[in-house]
């Protein structure tokens, strides 16, 4: 019996050692530890077999220098000796797929594209950081990693409409996405509380629409009056700054998807150009959170001229295939009372105001399609009918995504109870001294995020409609970037693992690897939330 017990203990220890060698987040498809180690030092180089790989190689070297102190150089001529990191493109692999082979002689990394190589380097970055050594020498354990993502769309959304974040802060957000192999940055640029992007044809959007007179303090209910801080608040991105951010993201293989929310969430635009509203104002940039009854008028041609003018400049700034046009939380009260909207309903043979919104969205989609772009919209675009070519972002629950999938639309799953990273992170916000969050009732610990199943209740054919997942960071109660990081991390890692490792998830193993990744968060100076790491849910 004693002999059996000893064998059991030996097996457990052996397995734990093997598992401990995998430190990569998100979890790779296949990880096999090998015998031995390879030494990297200041003489080691990153050899690129294709000029297109200089960029990801250079980024990798900057990561290793900042996080480990080890200075590596990039070369295009084949070097001799050991400790070489060799990068190449293998067209037989999928675009985002990579193979990483660490041997005693060196490191060989192949990707299906530049992007695949970049993801392999993000994995190697984590491996090197956790390896023994210092700025002079690092010993990396030998291993073989075969990896590719399950979902092609893996997104992170940042709302800069409620609170503004600087160019450097947005770039840091992008860096966080890149570390987790997130490949879409959904940039929520316009809101009732502020218009955040320069549109040259409509200068009042930033002259007037980017600044609110004051901001709501704390919460309020229907039984109490809102309290304001009395301080003007504003900010916007110039077009040159937008180009800089898009370039920065592109260098990290992240597609920036701009969102111009319409027809609702447009009070800042209405304050800038009152003639675009059903009542023609006066309007002011909204000081309080919540949903406004005032939305763009769907009955006047002037509204569509405005939208096309704005989107023409957006198209020029963002090379993304997708443009997000919102479509959420658009009350129909003003449309019901607006003679122009009612006339439009009659002339177009529409059934009601929901079909009027469908007309509105389809018309905008047609304009974007003429410029080679596709739309994403929040799941409200399903109401009143939606074109088959629209991609639906399901936020009000997985059932909305299921509905869209059954209709044949492409779907991005981002349901509130799994993916809204502005929610509280523990069961007792006060006891755990959590900062302000969107909902005091809704709790979203990292375990809950990790449990998301984007395919739930879908058959094999319907599953093909689900193109990915996304974590959303709304900022009504997040006034600065330090707070934003606290809400984002470590829960974004769970979103990333759902998107990348859907077929290979294991929460216990995720927890172990996250305790390793936490050290890299510390080194990068990220202000992550501590609850999960302290065993608090």
Predicted regions and their residues:
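Contiguous, structured surface segment used for ligand recognition
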Residues: 20-153, 483, 495, 499-528, ...
């Amino acid at each position: 019996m004693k002999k059996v017990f000893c064998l059991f203990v030996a097996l457990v220890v052996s397995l734990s050692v093997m598992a401990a060698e995998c430190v990569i987040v998100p979890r790779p498809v296949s990880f096999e530890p090998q015998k031995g180690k390879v030494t990297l030092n200041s003489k080691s180089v990153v050899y690129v077999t294709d000029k297109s790989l200089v960029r990801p190689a250079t980024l990798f070297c900057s990561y290793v220098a900042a996080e480990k102190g080890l200075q590596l150089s990039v070369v295009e001529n084949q070097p001799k000796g050991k400790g070489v990191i060799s990068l190449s493109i293998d067209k037989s692999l999928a675009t985002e797929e990579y193979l990483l082979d660490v041997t005693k002689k060196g490191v060989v990394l192949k990707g299906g594209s530049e992007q695949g190589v970049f993801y392999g380097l993000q994995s190697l970055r984590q491996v090197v950081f956790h390896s023994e050594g210092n700025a002079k020498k690092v010993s990396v354990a030998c291993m073989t990693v075969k990896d590719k993502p399950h979902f092609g769309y893996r997104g992170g959304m940042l709302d800069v409409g409620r609170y503004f974040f600087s160019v450097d802060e947005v770039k840091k957000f992008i860096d966080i996405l890149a570390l987790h192999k997130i490949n879409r940055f959904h940039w929520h640029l316009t809101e009732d509380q502020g218009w955040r992007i320069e549109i040259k044809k409509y200068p009042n959007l930033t002259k007037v629409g980017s600044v609110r007179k004051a901001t709501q303090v704390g919460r309020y209910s229907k039984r109490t009056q809102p309290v304001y801080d009395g301080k003007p608040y504003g900010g916007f991105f110039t077009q040159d700054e937008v180009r800089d951010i898009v370039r920065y993201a592109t260098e990290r293989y992240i597609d920036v998807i701009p969102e111009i929310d319409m027809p609702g969430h447009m009070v800042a635009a209405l304050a800038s150009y009152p003639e675009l509203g059903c009542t023609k104002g006066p309007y002011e940039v909204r000081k309080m959170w919540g949903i406004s009854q005032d939305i763009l008028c769907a009955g006047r041609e002037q509204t569509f001229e405005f939208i096309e003018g704005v989107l023409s400049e957006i198209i020029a700034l963002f090379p993304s295939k997708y443009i997000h046009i919102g479509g959420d939380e658009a009350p129909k009260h003003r449309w019901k009372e607006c003679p122009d909207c009612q006339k439009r309903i009659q002339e177009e043979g529409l059934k009601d105001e929901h079909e009027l919104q469908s007309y509105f969205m389809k018309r905008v989609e047609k304009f974007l399609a003429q410029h080679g772009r596709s739309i994403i919209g929040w799941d409200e675009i399903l109401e009143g009918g939606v074109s088959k070519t629209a991609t639906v972002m399901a936020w009000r629950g997985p059932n909305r995504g299921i509905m869209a999938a059954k209709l044949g639309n492409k779907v991005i799953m981002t349901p509130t109870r799994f993916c809204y990273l502005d929610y509280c992170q523990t069961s007792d916000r006060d006891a755990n001294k959590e900062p302000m969050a969107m909902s005091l009732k809704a709790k979203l610990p990292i375990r809950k995020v990790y449990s998301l199943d984007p395919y739930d209740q879908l058959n094999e054919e319907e599953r093909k409609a689900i193109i990915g997942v996304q974590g959303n960071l709304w900022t009504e109660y997040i006034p600065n970037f330090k707070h934003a990081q606290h809400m984002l991390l470590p829960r974004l890692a769970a979103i990333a693992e759902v998107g990348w490792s859907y077929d290979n998830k294991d929460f216990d193993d995720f927890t172990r690897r996250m305790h390793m990744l936490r050290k890299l968060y510390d080194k990068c100076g990220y202000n992550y939330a501590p609850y999960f790491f302290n065993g608090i849910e």
